[in-house]
């Protein structure tokens, strides 16, 4: 198969951490042609989706003493050329957040592809509809108490009722901009003003879960089914477990409660064409559903001795 990956600049990716590189490596190993492009290199020509694609050859990472060893150079790009995306059997939309106007237009271009001929992972419409914070609200039964608002009074009332909380920007990623807020914090007004861009944007406010100190679990779902998990433990006084802010990873198991959460999400994820998803769970509560470019494959592979990228490609092969 020919597989196209819409990514951030290749030189900015960390092959020892990046899930996209892991999936591309797996595709290459299993005999498929791998191409890369960017959201800025998509076009519509005579009603068809096209992309400026460059074939890529990867030097796979190697696990040595529990760490990924990366060869240099780890990738080799051919000269890019315009190609109709209908020539590809699948397109992986793996551009990191934030979701910009350019990103949204890219999803409209990708929607011109017939899913039965060229599968887009994840679905363009699904990506537009599934804001990673707001989408979670459809599963309120398994979430901690949550409010979304830009109103200081409502947010203060929430804190008085539920105690300490975390404030999350609706368009954030990798723990960026998440703040811890105590009911009696003298900086309350300032923190809310910062989070809401001075009353211009609503934020998500969730009850703080003390279990966060034991870890924020990332569970990878493929077509709605859990295929692996990793625990991300905050470092020092930090309350966020995200790897991007220094969280340490540890092996973990998927509990019966978490299997129930996955089963609850599965029908909706499948209906929305969200095939490759990473959910975050703290203390048995769903906190986020990550659909744009979920990470965690490299860490799970390293800790569990598996190859989740190959699972993704083997699943894809069965779709045709």
Swiss-Prot record:
Cofactor: binding details: Binds 1 Mg(2+) or Mn(2+) ion per subunit.
Database matches in PROSITE patterns: ATP_GRASP (PS50975)
An example Gene Ontology molecular-function term: metal ion binding
One matching Pfam family: GSH-S_ATP
UniProt KW Magnesium keyword: yes
InterPro entries: ATP-grasp, ATP_grasp_subdomain_1, Glut_synth_pro, GSHS_ATP-bd, GSHS_N, PreATP-grasp_dom_sf
GO cellular component terms given for this protein: cytoplasm
Domain ATP-grasp residue range list: 133-317
Family recorded in the similarity comment: Belongs to the prokaryotic GSH synthase family.
Protein name as catalogued: Glutathione synthetase
Organism of derivation: Synechocystis sp. (strain ATCC 27184 / PCC 6803 / Kazusa)
């Amino acid at each position: 198969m020919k597989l196209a990956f819409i990514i951030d600049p290749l030189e900015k990716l960390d092959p020892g951490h990046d899930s996209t590189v892991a999936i591309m490596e797996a595709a290459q190993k299993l005999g498929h042609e791998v191409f890369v492009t960017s959201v800025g290199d998509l076009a519509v020509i005579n009603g068809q989706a096209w992309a400026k694609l460059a074939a890529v050859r990867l030097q796979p990472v190697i696990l040595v003493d529990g760490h990924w060893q990366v060869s240099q150079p780890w990738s080799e790009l051919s000269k890019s050329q315009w190609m109709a995306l209908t020539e590809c059997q699948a397109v992986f939309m793996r551009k990191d957040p934030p979701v910009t106007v350019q990103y949204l237009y890219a999803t409209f271009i990708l929607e011109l592809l017939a899913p039965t001929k060229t599968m887009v992972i994840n679905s363009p419409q699904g990506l537009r509809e599934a804001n990673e914070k707001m989408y979670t609200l459809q599963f309120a039964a398994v979430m901690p108490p949550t409010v979304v608002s830009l109103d200081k009074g409502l947010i203060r009332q929430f804190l008085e009722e539920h105690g300490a909380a975390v404030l999350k920007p609706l368009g954030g990623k990798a723990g960026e901009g998440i703040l811890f807020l105590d009911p009696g914090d003298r900086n309350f007004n300032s923190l809310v003003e910062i989070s809401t861009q001075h009353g211009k944007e609503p934020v998500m406010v969730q009850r703080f879960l003390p279990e966060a100190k034991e870890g924020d679990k990332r569970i990878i779902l493929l077509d709605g089914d859990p295929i692996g998990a990793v625990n991300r433990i905050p470092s020092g006084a930090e309350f966020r477990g995200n790897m991007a802010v220094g969280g340490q990873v540890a092996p973990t198991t998927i509990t019966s409660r978490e299997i129930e959460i996955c089963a609850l999400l599965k029908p909706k994820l499948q209906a929305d064409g969200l095939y490759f998803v990473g959910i975050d769970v703290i203390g048995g509560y769903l906190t986020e559903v990550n659909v744009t470019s979920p990470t965690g494959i490299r860490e799970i592979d390293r800790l569990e001795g598996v190859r989740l990228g190959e699972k993704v490609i083997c699943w894809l092969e069965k779709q045709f």
